[in-house]
Amino acid sequence: MILVNIDTYGFDCQSEGMPQIHFLDVTNRDGVQTARTGLSKFGKTMVNFYLGRLGVAQSEIGFPFLFHEVPYVRAQIALAEAGAFGDLRLSGWCRGVPQDVEKAVQVRAGGKGLAHYNLSISTSDYMLANKFRGKLDRDAVIREMTAAVRAAKAGGARTVGVNAEDGSRTDDGFLTEFALAAKEAGADRVRYCDTIGGDTPDRIRERFAKLASAVGMPVETHCHNDLGLAVANSIHGALGDLQAGQDAWINTCVNGIGERSGNADLLSTILAFRHAFDPQVNGSEIGDPIDLSWARRFALWASYAFGQPLPYNQVGVGRNAFAHESGIHADGALKDHGNYELYDDETLGPFPDDWHARRGRVVLTGEYGGKAGFRHVMDGLGVEPADEELSFKLVQLCNAQTSRPLTDDELRLIAEYPRELALLFSGAIE
């Protein structure tokens, strides 16, 4: 499709090879940092499974330099190689210092390590003064960051993104200097972090367009929701990238979870690029093969796994997202749901009907289950485990780790990829 739109910023969208939108989900890094909640390593594995099914480009899977993440990272590498996550790219997050990176690149499975990294360091004068407290100045920030980029590339990384933490409070001059130094060291993108969520759509678009033009590489959005603007800011930041002729990379989290008030919600952001009335937005080309038929299952699974109930008005997947009661609205929706609905709820996929949620007499499998119950459940799901004995042990271990009944999708993944998942429990399975 060829689109023609000259917007108020002077961006000519007429191109068959126009820049594209990509989604880099950070649920397994920023999302799991959410206070008062948590996610097991098996749960983080399921996030990658769902992101792969949804068609997202990349998952920031966690912290490969941390000792307790190492078995998990190895399992993700093995699962990706086995095809469990489709075309999903896996990336690791490190602080923007070479010591973290040197540890991370040593984590391997089957001789392969992570191919993608994001390296983060604070750039604002506020954080230099009040976080580092004189330990680092601007020159030191650039020195540490460039050394980290070179270490990642020397360790085999295909792509490296450099994160300007508190980028929204960093002046244009230093942001440009930081990004150009990163590019010279081998970085492929710079992540502009609206760390405390104070940016606004017009401001962030202007800054992205200016920065992406100045450095000649994509500026990645990382927007927090402290003012309720994370999705809007992510969209406008991406438009600034496109205006500068660069691909846009948008950070998201499932259900908008994340530090404090959360991050840009994955589903809301995708739906905006598909259904917003502004042709600059719905006319932007998404470069990822998004399959929204997995959206509802992912969102509801995440609510269950994180133990965070979805608000009734959660975009697309809340209980009231397609509910009508008042007279005028109900009448209009009964005649044609398009009168009061922007998109069809069926496009978001079916509601899960998990084995463990059945009522009445039911036989389950889990931490203390036996072979008969395990076989009964697998037969009921129509699943033939690749390795029955190993899958049986993994069901017990995963149930013990999550402290909740396993879902049908979790049981299917265990049955299909038991050898790779066993790496999560290094030393626990003989």
What are these regions (language model features)?
Residues 1-98, 365, 369, 375, ...:
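N-terminal capping/small domains of soluble enzymes
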Residues 26-29, 62-66, 93-97, 120-124, ...:
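Active-site beta-loop-alpha junctions enriched in small/polar residues
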Residues 2-21, 25-27, 271-273, 277-430:
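A mid-to-C-terminal "edge-of-domain" accessory segment
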Residues 45, 68-70, 170-171, 200, ...:
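Short secondary-structure boundary/hinge segments and terminal tails
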Residues 196-339:
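Catalytic alpha/beta core domains of metabolic enzymes, predominantly
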Residues 37, 62, 94, 168, ...:
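Hydrophobic alpha-helical scaffolding
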Residues 37-44, 69, 97, 138-145, ...:
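Generic structural signal for well-ordered, non-membrane alpha-helical segments
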Residues 21-23, 33-56, 73-84, 98-217, ...:
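Alpha/beta enzyme core
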